[in-house]
């Protein structure tokens, strides 16, 4: 079908097709183009979902293998986490902080671990995961001291545990 189609009005999804050879316009309405496009979109959506599922399964497999082999530990590293909680005595001035306490950090970990982007460098996992939540989780403080609420955070994994901090 030619890309030069005529629409009856701005919001109409029906297309008026015409014969390119004779130039005579036919008043034939067709929803074929719209239906074909919808099918294409569905196929693309299915492919994207499969990619995401494969990525999440791969992330979970990497994390599970790392836990089993002792590379990372499923326990909150409280001393590091307190540096990123403004209400705690261990908070370091100028660091990004999450809203809530250690329980909040554990809840974020349980909800989002394995669902973000594992950070790799030259094919090796750096024991970091980049996550985007649907809700605000804390405040990111940049190098100039400007504070911005954010729904993004990092999980840093290690042999002695994990900790979480907001990112931009």
Question: Where do the language-model regions lie?
Answer:
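Functional cores of ribonucleases/endoribonucleases
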Residues: 1, 60-168
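Activation/maturation switch segments at domain boundaries
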Residues: 1-69, 139-168
